[in-house]
Swiss-Prot record:
Homodimer. This is Triosephosphate isomerase. The keyword Ribosomal protein does not apply. The keyword Lipoprotein does not apply. Belongs to the triosephosphate isomerase family. It comes from the Eukaryota. The gene is TPI1. PROSITE patterns: TIM_1, TIM_2. It is an enzyme of class 5 (isomerase). One of its GO terms (biological process) is canonical glycolysis. Pfam families: TIM.
Length: 248
């Protein structure tokens, strides 16, 4: 099944009004490959700003987090209704930094995912193992554990993209080999097929999210189950366009 190549840019807690303007203008004027979908995820304070600037038809905007309530006395949280209201289409959920620094667990991530989808916001769902888990040889056990509560709550996977992000590779400059990523992505897809159907699993895009950059992105080109990237630091730089065009 042909799956549209997908590149997400997670700006994390970086950027200013001016730098985000420069990033968006670079994307607006770039010669992007036809067969790619791009989502940029700036800090929440700049969501509206980014949406107002984007003019390229292949580029949309997403948030980096959302809560399980649409409104109420939840100081500091992001509402999916408000994310949608400013024109953003996506939200990143389950990122390892949210799991590590803010103690989000698998069940919370599943609740957030189900709620965002229910309210009409598409989800980039992050899963992945730590270095200790990798060394222990339990990578697949970890990603299956992370996916299981989501599978129990979400029956329609049309608007979900999975990002496999080995925690040991995020922000470290280390990266899984393209071959290793392919093996893990294929196993994730097989697990989805077991729990849903082969048709559903074959339609879900699975991204690689561990220190992808302009230098290594092309090495993933021929990997059948690597459907794109969730990019961190490199999404703030001109090389982001090279990553987007890495399958041209």
């Amino acid at each position: 099944m042909a799956r549209t190549f997908f590149v997400g840019g997670n700006f994390k807690l970086n950027g200013s009004k001016q730098s985000i303007k420069e990033i968006v203008e670079r994307l607006n004027t770039a010669d992007l490959a036809d067969n790619v979908e791009v989502v940029i995820c700036p800090p929440a304070t700049y969501l509206d700003h980014a949406v107002s600037l984007v003019s390229h038809p292949q580029v949309t905007v997403g948030a980096q987090n959302a809560y399980t309530k649409a409104s109420g006395a939840y100081t500091g949280e992001n509402s999916v209704d408000q994310i949608k209201d400013v024109g953003a289409k996506w939200v990143i959920l389950g990122h390892s930094e949210r799991r590590t620094y803010f103690n989000e667990d698998d069940e919370q991530v599943a609740e957030k995912t189900a709620f965002a989808l229910e309210r009409g916001v598409s989800v980039i769902l992050c899963i992945g193992e730590t270095l200790d888990e990798k060394k222990a040889g339990v990578t697949l056990d970890v990603v299956k554990r992370q996916l299981t509560p989501v599978l129990e709550k979400v029956k329609d996977w049309t608007n979900v993209v999975i990002a496999y992000e080995p925690v040991w590779a995020i922000g470290t400059g280390l990266a899984a080999t393209a071959e290793d990523a392919q093996d893990i992505h294929a196993a994730i897809r097989d697990f989805l097929a077991e729990r849903t159907s082969r048709d559903v699993a074959d339609a879900v895009r699975i991204l690689y999210g561990g220190s992808a950059n302009g230098a290594n992105a092309a090495s993933f080109r021929d990997k059948a189950d690597v459907d794109g990237f969730l990019v961190g630091g490199a999404s703030l730089k001109p090389e982001f366009v090279d990553i987007i065009n890495s399958r041209r």
